[in-house]
Amino acid sequence: MAPSVQAEVDEGANHTNGFPEFNASRRRQPPPKLKKPVPHYRHLVRWNKYSIPESIEEQQLNQDLLICRQLLNLFFNANMAEAESILAKGQIPVTENQVDLHAFDGLQGTASTNLLQKTLDALGLTLEDIKDDSDDLPSETSSSAASSKDGKKSPSTTPSIAPSTHGKKNKVKKEKEVKSMYYGLGGAIIQGLRALVTFDPEEIEKGVEAFEQAAKAADKLRKGTIIGLGSVKAVGSFVVGTIGAGSFRGMNRVQKHAELIYAESTILRSLLSVLYHVDVWMVFEECINLRHAFTIIQGLKSYMDSVESELRAGKNIDHHQIDEHLVSGVTLSYSLYNIIISFMPDIIVKMLQFIGFPSDRDWGMAMLAACGDWDPMAPPETPAQHAERLASSANDGIRRQFCDMVPIIFQVIVSSFIPMNHVDLNYAQMINDYNLELYPNSPIFLFFKGRHLQVTSKFDDAVSTYKSAQAKIQPRWHNINHIFVFEELMIAMTRSDHETACENSRQLLKESRWSKCCFRYLTVITGYERGVKSERKKIDTLMGKVESGMQTVAGMNLFFETFCARKSKRYLKEGHLLLPSYDFMLLWNTFDMMPLDVLGEALAKISTEVSRLQGLLPQKMKDRENQPLAPKDQTMEAFSGGYLSSIFSNKNALIKDSKVEGYENFYDDYCLAFFLQGVVAYHLAFFPEAAFDREKCELALKSFDTVFRYAPLIKDDTYTYYFTHYYKAKIWIHQGRLDDAQARFKYLLGLSNTNLLGLPALVGGKGKNSLEIMVLFKVHSGLLEIETARAAASGYASSIMSSK
C-alpha cells in the first residue's frame, strides 16, 4: 500500500482511526432542528362540506370540490381513464340537483369497481355515458411515436422536444373554454401528466394551453379590485412585491380558491412551458411568472398565519371559512418553493432569496408533514389512532395526497441521486402504507413501494411490486409502464442480468420517446455486454444514431444525453467500451442500492479489468509510479511543485513514454477502472448497518490516488477526476475530518465552469466535464452534510459539558 494511503487511514483520534466501528443506518437519520416554528394549518379548518351556503357560486364550488376529490380517488385507484372521461364531460350545474353529495362518504379504500360504480351513481351517470365520451379522448399509445426494432426514427420523432413549427399553434386544436376552475385545473393536470409520460411536443403544447384555460377560469372569479392584488403582474412587484394578509380578509371563500387556482395554474404552465420552449429568454419570462405566482401563494400563507394567530389568542375563526382544500393547496405550493430552491447552488439561492423566495428545505418538509399530521419520530399508531386518521375530514383536502407524495419522492427517489440529510425511509414507508390502504390499486403508490424496496436492496420484492403495478395500468395510460420498465432495467444492469436488461432497453427504445439518445445507448451497451457476436453489426449501427437522438430542454442539452453521446463517439472511434453498465450506473447512483453480494461481484469484475489495464501500462510509466504523491491534498494545485512541473518541462517525453499502441484513450479507461474500483470499495467499506471494512477503505483510497496521478492524461472522461474528489471527501466525512472535506468540496465548486481552463486534461484533452451538474448537486449536499455533522458534534459536546 502506498505510504500516502496508509497515512490517510491512520489519521484519527480513536482506536478506529476516526472511522465508526459500525456504519450508520440508511433507513433512519435524526430529524433536523428547525430554525422556525411550523404552522399547523389543518387546525384552521372550520367548514362543513354539507352545509348549504346562500351563494350559488359557493354551492357550485362545494359540489365541484367534492366531485373532483372523488375523481382524484378514482385516478389514484387505477380508474384513470374513467376519471378523465367524467372530467371531460364538464361541470354539472348545481341548480340541476343531479349530484348526491352524501353518496361520496366513505368511498376511499373500496374496491376499484365498486368505487367507480358508486361514483357514477352519485353523479347520476352510467358506465355507458363515460364510455361514449372516452372515444373522443386522445389515446396515449397513439402518440408514443414508437420506433422500429432497429432504432430507426419514426416520422414524429425529433431530436428536440419543441417541434420545428415552434410558435404556430394552429396545428394544435385549441382547448375549449372551461367554466369551472377546478375542472379546468384537473383537466390540465391530466393533460400535463400525459405530456410528461409521452414527451410529445403536441401533447406538451396542449398541456400549456390547458393550464392557460384553467388560469383564465380562475381569473374571472378573482377579486381584482383589491389594491395590490391587481398589480401582482406589475414589474415593480418582481423584487419585493407581496400581497398582504389583509387583502384576503376581504375575500369570500370562492375568491380565495380562485387566487390559489390562478397561482397553481400559472406555476404548472410555466414549468411545462420550460420543457416546450427552446428559447432561453422564454425561460427567463417563465421565471418572472413563477415570481408573480409566488406573491399570491405567499399572501395566502400570510393570511393563514394571521388566522392561526387569532386561534392561538382564543378568538373565533369560523367566519374565515377555511376548508381543507385551501389548507392543502397553500401548504403544498409554499413548501415546494422552499424545497426545490434549496437544492440549487448557493449563489443562485442567494439571488432568489434577494427577490423574496424562501429556501428552507427542512422547514418545507416539516410543513408538509404537519398537513398530514405526520411525526417521523412518533411510535406506531394504535388501531384507534389509525381509524381516527382515516376518518378525519382534514385528510380530504384535494391536494392532500400530493402533500404526502412529496416527502416520499424525496426520500426514496431524489435522495438516491442527490445525497440528502435526514433521510428516513421508515417515515416514507409509513406515509406510503397509509395511502396504499386508501388506494390499494394505485400504480403511483405501488411504484413508491417498489422504489422503497429497491433502495433498501430488496430487488426481488421490488421487481414483483413493479410487475403488480404494471398490471393495473389501463391501456390509455400505457406509457406509465415505462417508468417501471426503466427501474427493472436498472435492477437487471445492477445484477449483470444482461438478457433482461437487453429486453427492457429494447422495449423502451421501441415504445418511449423520453430520451431516444439514452435508450439507444442503453440498448447498445446491454447488447454489447450480452456478447452475442451476430448482433455486433446492429450494435455498431445503432451506436451511430445515439447522438442524433439528443434533445434540448430550456435551450440546454440534458447531461445524461451528453454523457451517452460522448461515449458513443468513443465506441465508434475505438470499437469498445470499458465496463459500460457500471459506468452508466454512476448517473443513477445504483451503487448505493446494491446489496453486499452484488457489490462483491461488481468489485471482482472491475478488479479483473484493473489488472488487465495494469498489464498494458508502459514500463516507463510504471517507473514513474515510484514518485511520491503530495502527502495530503491530491488536488492539481498540490501537484504544481512536483508532478505537474515535470509534465510541463518534459511534455514531449511524457507523451512518448505514456503512449499505448492502438489505444488512444488508454488513460481515460485506466482512470475509469480505478475510479469504479474505488467507488465499489467505498460502498463496501461503509455499507449501512454493517461493520466498517478497513481493508476496503484502504483499497478505495489507493484507487482514488491512482486516478489523481493519471488525471492529467485523461482526454475525454474528465468526470472521473471530479467524482474521485467527491468520494474522497465523503471518506473524510466518515472519518470526522470535516475541515478537509469542506476544503475539497469548495475546490470542486471552483472548477464548476464549463471551460475548466487548464484542468485537468493538461496534456491533450478538452477539459470538459459532461456530468458537471451532478457534481455540483452532490457537492452542495455534501456541504450541508458537513454543517449537520458539525451541529451534531457541537450538540454532543455541549451535552457532555453540561453533564459535567
Where are each of the predicted segments found?
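Fungal intrinsically disordered, low-complexity serine/threonine- and proline-rich regulatory regions
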Residues: 1-37, 134-166, 798-804
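N-terminal alpha-helical scaffolding segments that mark the starts
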Residues: 2, 8-96, 100-105, 178, ...
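Solenoid-like repeat scaffolds
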Residues: 54-57, 88-95, 171, 353-358, ...
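Short coil/linker segments at helix-helix boundaries
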Residues: 60-63, 77-82, 104-141, 145-434, ...
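Generic helix N-cap/helix-start motif at coil->alpha-helix transitions
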Residues: 61-66, 400-402, 439-446, 477-485, ...
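Structural register within alpha-helical repeat arrays
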Residues: 70, 101, 187, 194, ...
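Boundary/linker segments of alpha-helical solenoid repeat arrays
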Residues: 95-103, 218-226, 230, 308-310, ...
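Eukaryotic alpha-helical solenoid repeat scaffolds
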Residues: 400, 525, 529-714, 718-725, ...
